[in-house]
Curated annotation (Swiss-Prot):
Primary localization class, coarse: other
UniProt PTM comment: Glycosylated. Glycosylation may protect the protein from proteolytic degradation and be important for hemagglutination. It suggests that the carbohydrate moiety may be located within the C-terminal domain of HbhA.
Chain intervals with Basic residues compositional bias: 181-199
Organism, scientific name: Mycobacterium tuberculosis (strain ATCC 25618 / H37Rv)
Other known facts: Serum from patients diagnosed with active tuberculosis that had not been vaccinated contains antibodies that recognize HbhA, whereas serum from healthy individuals does not contain any.
Any single biological process term in GO: heterophilic cell-cell adhesion via plasma membrane cell adhesion molecules
Gene, per the UniProt record: hbhA
SUPFAM superfamilies per UniProt: Apolipoprotein A-I
GO CC terms of this entry: cell surface; cytosol; peptidoglycan-based cell wall; plasma membrane
Protein name from the UniProt record: Heparin-binding hemagglutinin
Keywords: Cell adhesion, Glycoprotein, Hemagglutinin, Heparin-binding, Virulence
Entry's free-text remark on domains: Heparin binding seems to require the C-terminal domain of HbhA. Progressive truncations from the C-terminal end diminish the affinity for heparin.
Family stated for the protein in its record: To M.leprae HbhA.
Record's keyword annotation contains Glycoprotein: yes
Job description of the protein: Required for extrapulmonary dissemination. Mediates adherence to epithelial cells by binding to sulfated glycoconjugates present at the surface of these cells; binds heparin, dextran sulfate, fucoidan and chondroitin sulfate. Promotes hemagglutination of erythrocytes of certain host species. Induces mycobacterial aggregation.
Length: 199
């Protein structure tokens, strides 16, 4: 009797799995049938559209010479030239209006005080960005030098004195305006002081 209860316990999950597989198979078969039907409908629809398009093209080929003849009869070369000149004048006039409008908008922007302020502020930000970039480059260079010196000491290699690299860095800073150079030198000295404390 214990064996029957074990079989019954196993039987239900197996039958559930078999039922799920059967349901999945039925669903897949239904999908395949639907896809086949749709494919056949699409083929039929496509064939009819192709036939309609061919019929239209054939009719256009037949009607085109007649339509061209009618157009030639309706419009002489002079009438066509006049129509083209009219379109050209309208396009040129519209273009000129847009140019005038753009010039007026630019003048309004320039006459506003905020435009000048924004322009001056933008120049200030650019100057600050240049200063900060040069400052960061100086800091990175000095820190790289310090790391190189430490590594050389560990290996036992003697590096040239700091006086030569400092002379090279100074002319690069002098190339900038005097106010910026003074601002750059002060942070660079602070960075050097930090290196000394780190050793």
């Amino acid at each position: 009797m214990a064996e029957n209860s074990n079989i019954d316990d196993i039987k239900a999950p197996l039958l559930a799995a078999l039922g799920a597989a059967d349901l999945a198979l039925a669903t897949v078969n239904e999908l395949i049938t639907n896809l086949r039907e749709r494919a056949e409908e699409t083929r039929t629809d496509t064939r009819s559209r192709v036939e309609e398009s061919r019929a239209r093209l054939t009719k256009l080929q037949e009607d085109l010479p007649e339509q061209l003849t009618e157009l030639r009869e309706k419009f002489t070369a002079e009438e066509l030239r006049k129509a083209a000149e009219g379109y050209l004048e309208a396009a040129t006039s519209r273009y000129n209006e847009l140019v005038e409008r753009g010039e007026a908008a630019l003048e309004r922007l320039r006459s506003q005080q905020s435009f000048e302020e924004v322009s001056a502020r933008a120049e200030g930000y650019v100057d600050q960005a240049v200063e900060l970039t040069q400052e960061a480059l100086g800091t990175v260079a000095s820190q790289t030098r310090a790391v190189g010196e430490r590594a050389a000491k560990l290996v036992g290699i003697e590096l040239p004195k700091k006086a030569a690299p400092a002379k090279k860095a100074a002319p690069a800073k002098k190339a900038a305006p005097a106010k910026k150079a003074a601002a750059k030198k002060a942070p660079a000295k602070k960075a050097a002081a930090k290196k000394v404390t780190q050793k």
